[in-house]
Amino acid sequence: MNPPFFIGPLAPGFRVPPGDTAALSTNKIIYDLLFAENKVDTPTIGFVDVRDVAIGLVKGQKTPGKHRIVFGGEWFTLGEAVDYIASIHPELKGRLATASPTTQKKSLLDNSKAALVLDLTPRSWKESVRNGIDDLLKLEKSWVL
């Protein structure tokens, strides 16, 4: 499988030293949306939920034949992600980054082979962002304790 950025929830028991945001890998893109001083100007993000990658890799090992599968989730703008985070966590509104307006948003990936060969359909970007943000907020609280 050749996915784009991985986002979503952290692995159970995943520990990160306080403030070590580099350990978040590509989830840092989502974490950075939690800081008002950040100006987000990346128009779109191609992503896949980390859980879908894991499922795809396991199913791929069990599928006969050799396949090269490109797989990714629906694309979204980081401005949409900021707005969505504000809607599910209204207490964060004053804390969130600002995003440049953009209309550029189009997934260039065709997931039909993943659906056919692996019976795999990507999760929505909202589910991945919600689960990722929730875990990142829990992690952040553990840094303060």
Feature roles, as predicted:
Residues 100-119:
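Conserved C-terminal active-site "lid" loop/helix of NAD(P)H-dependent oxidoreductases
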Residues 15-48:
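A conserved pocket-lining segment of Rossmann-fold NAD(P)-dependent short-chain dehydrogenase/reductase
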Residues 9-26, 59-68:
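Glycine/proline-rich active-site loop of Rossmann-fold NAD(P)-dependent oxidoreductases
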Residues 31-32, 64, 107-110:
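Mature, structured extracellular domains of secreted fungal proteins
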Residues 5-7, 75:
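Short, flexible loop/turn elements at secondary-structure junctions
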Residues 91, 119-120:
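Helix N-cap/coil-helix junction residues
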Residues 43-47, 54-101, 111, 125, ...:
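Mid/C-terminal beta-alpha module of Rossmann-like enzyme folds, strongest
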